[in-house]
């Protein structure tokens, strides 16, 4: 009889313990922009990302957050059966895992915060979630690199007689000469001539660039910010938002990560048919670069000036993809068409100089040995 009483008491005690066991009110859930995710990075909204919340099955105070890109964006190009690695939340990381300790359960809500180190990055996180909604704030410090906390202005534009007439634009294109008039011409000289002669709103192309882009800053959180104007006539410089362009530095190269969703949310959708043709043909390669990072070479000279550029390994595959389009006369005509053209000088320049270059583009591309396109910069005063 005494043994039966002891067993009965033990049974009731066991049931009582089970009733008091704390359970996480949220099961494994994937949060995205369209599924309740409010993600901020350095205090500003970050779009196009995914956070998977996974509770610990044996300890309700623990969970993991898996940060990655939104896989739906990587599948925009349905012609590809293979989906490339997606650019994640932290620049250079396709996936980042945060291990939550001491999570607080408040009714149907979970509250958490902590610090995680991932591949040299220090990630401070704070957030909360209920079923179907998550708020997550990240403050990130990237590994130290030579560009962090530096700002650069556009190199000053010279003239055909003094300084560098192409600055701040950097172009080096080594290819066989192409037919031009009664002789031949090399593409490097042709580009220099056109950039120095063509004018938009009374300014040559290098001057135009310097007139709308003033400064580029590499922030320690992995963001790149630009100081810019929407138009030459604007009197004040604007600062670009965060989480649009991000970077890492690895093996002497800068890898640029563009937030596809963030760009689409702010992009001006005006484009002519020819540009749409080019974008469509390049979409698979563009998606690869957006997801894996665009490799930029950079050189800092003894004078402190920096040249940042896309190299042959990036540009030549792109050029080979679009080169066949220039064999189509209608495509070239559409590309050159500009209903707003009013200057006879501009018309002569396009017909006499630019059109022969575009027609010869397949030949130029097929004989290209080296190509660099980028920016020439000088360190900004602090």
Mark where each language-model region is.
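Sec-dependent signal peptide recognition
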Residues: 1-5
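Signal peptide-directed secreted proteins
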Residues: 192-195, 216-219, 225-227, 285-382
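Contiguous, well-ordered beta-strand patches that form the walls/edges
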Residues: 62-123, 200-327
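Acidic/polar, low-complexity intrinsically disordered N-terminal segments immediately downstream
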Residues: 16-189, 334-382
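Acidic, serine/threonine- and glycine-rich low-complexity intrinsically disordered segments
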Residues: 141-231, 235-238, 258-260, 265-275, ...
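C-terminal motif of bacterial Sec signal peptides marking the signal peptidase cleavage site
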Residues: 11-14
């Amino acid at each position: 009889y005494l043994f039966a009483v002891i067993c009965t008491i033990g049974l009731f005690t066991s049931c009582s313990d089970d009733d008091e066991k704390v359970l996480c009110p949220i099961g494994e859930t994937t949060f995205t922009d369209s599924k309740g995710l409010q993600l901020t990075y350095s205090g500003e909204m970050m779009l196009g990302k995914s956070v998977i919340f996974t509770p610990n099955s044996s300890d309700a105070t623990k969970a993991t957050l898996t940060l990655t890109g939104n896989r739906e964006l990587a599948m925009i190009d349905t012609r590809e059966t293979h989906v490339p690695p997606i650019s994640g939340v932290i620049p250079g990381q396709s996936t980042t895992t945060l291990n939550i300790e001491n999570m607080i359960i408040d009714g149907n809500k979970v509250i958490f915060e902590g610090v995680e180190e991932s591949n040299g990055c220090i990630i401070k996180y704070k957030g909360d979630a209920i079923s179907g909604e998550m708020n997550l704030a990240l403050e990130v410090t990237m590994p130290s690199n030579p560009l962090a906390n530096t700002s650069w202005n556009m190199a000053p534009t010279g003239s055909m007689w003094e300084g560098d007439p192409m600055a701040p634009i950097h172009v080096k294109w080594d290819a066989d000469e192409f037919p031009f008039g009664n002789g031949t011409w090399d593409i490097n000289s042709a580009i220099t001539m056109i950039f120095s002669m063509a004018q938009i709103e009374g300014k040559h192309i290098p001057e135009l660039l310097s007139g709308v882009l003033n400064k580029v800053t590499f922030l320690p959180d992995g963001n790149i910010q630009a100081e810019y104007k929407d138009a030459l006539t604007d009197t004040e410089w604007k600062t670009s938002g965060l989480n649009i362009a991000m970077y890492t530095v690895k093996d002497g190269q800068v890898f640029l990560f563009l937030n596809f969703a963030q760009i689409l949310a702010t992009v001006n959708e005006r484009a002519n048919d020819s540009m749409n043709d080019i974008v469509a043909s390049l979409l698979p390669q563009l998606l690869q670069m957006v997801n894996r990072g665009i490799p930029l070479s950079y050189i800092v000279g003894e004078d402190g000036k920096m040249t940042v550029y896309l190299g042959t390994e990036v540009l030549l595959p792109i050029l080979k993809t679009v080169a066949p389009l220039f064999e189509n006369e209608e495509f070239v005509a559409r590309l050159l068409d500009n209903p707003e053209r009013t200057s006879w000088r501009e018309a002569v320049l396009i017909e006499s100089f630019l059109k022969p270059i575009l027609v010869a583009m397949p030949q130029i591309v097929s004989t290209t040995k080296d190509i660099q396109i980028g920016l020439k910069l000088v360190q900004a005063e602090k």
